[in-house]
Amino acid sequence: MKVSDFDYTLPEDMIARYPPAERGTTRLLVLDPATGETEHSRYAHLADFLKPGDLLLLNNSKVVRARMFASKKTGASIELMLLEKHEGVQNLVLYRGRLKKGDRLIAHSEELLVEEITGQGVARLSASDGSDLPHLFERHAEVPIPPYLKREAEAVDAERYQTVFAEQPGSVAAPTASLNMTAGLLAELGQKGIDTATVTLHVGLGTFLPIRVESFEEHVMHREYYSIPFRTIDKIRRTKAGGGRVVAVGTTVTRALEHAAGSSCWGTSVAPASGEADIFIYPGYRFRVIDALLTNFHAPRSTVLMLTAAFAGQQNLLSAYHEAIEKQYRFLSYGDSMLIRPM
């Protein structure tokens, strides 16, 4: 199996450039992974496909102000995206433009020094006056939006590129599967006996990096910090014991849970779980925790598409994607959603 096996043609007009006028009004394609059969519904009707005793897992990470422009002394503009502490290193930025070690940049009257180029468009910066780089971004930067939207961030993005339950600052991209979740829908789920719990995974560098190799074995996933409270772990155990299903809202939740479940003490620990998830999930992977997955329609050749294929089955997923394109579903972050039902 090769990366090219997960390629498909995504028409440009299928990409949702803006959020829907009202949160929660998007469409929902429901896929049965056992048969490959599909059903067409609405995100607001999610409760119709779940049952009392099920548990919905949400990522409560909050998108931070991380995108800022600086200029070189030549006048050239450089786009900077602040990354969270990554593999033990702080003050990393993803940059667009040409930089080398020793370059000096000006951003909002502050001088920044390029301390190191770490590769793949990533640099380590410092402020010349010794001030804190994250605080500089918090004062002057904007909430980043995905580059495939092909537009500048607007006022609407400050609210809509954030979930209604975002609490823990740290992501440079939203956990998009729950962008359409509303307080009303969460209340409806609760009334029907469907519980919710949260994990935190700060979406980071890997979201913006393409797969540049053809062989899965050669691709290296970047690490993303996650934390799972013990009360969430306890709810998962109780749900499983009671015959309920664990429904992951998004690939970020899935990666956090499945990485944590790889720990030898997952089944017995009475403490929170945390770490840096570098798990690469693709077809052939055996899921340990999740029983259903609510997710967006993903870009071709992406790691999140491969994770979704691992859960749904590659042919099932690609057939459903072709059907979604035929029926004019909207793709990517601000688009429609897919529910892969429990088998």
Swiss-Prot record:
Alphabetically ordered keywords of this record: Cytoplasm, Queuosine biosynthesis, S-adenosyl-L-methionine, Transferase
A biological process term (GO) from this entry: queuosine biosynthetic process
Catalyzed reaction equations: 7-aminomethyl-7-carbaguanosine(34) in tRNA + S-adenosyl-L-methionine = epoxyqueuosine(34) in tRNA + adenine + L-methionine + 2 H(+)
The EC number(s) this enzyme carries: 2.4.99.17
An annotated GO cellular component: cytoplasm
Main localization (coarse): cytoplasm
Pfam families cross-referenced by the UniProt entry: Queuosine_synth
Subcellular location(s) per record: Cytoplasm
Role this protein plays: Transfers and isomerizes the ribose moiety from AdoMet to the 7-aminomethyl group of 7-deazaguanine (preQ1-tRNA) to give epoxyqueuosine (oQ-tRNA).
PANTHER family linked to this entry: S-ADENOSYLMETHIONINE:TRNA RIBOSYLTRANSFERASE-ISOMERASE
Name of the protein in its database record: S-adenosylmethionine:tRNA ribosyltransferase-isomerase
Organism whose genome encodes this protein: Chlorobium limicola (strain DSM 245 / NBRC 103803 / 6330)
Species lineage: Bacteria, Pseudomonadati, Chlorobiota, Chlorobiia, Chlorobiales
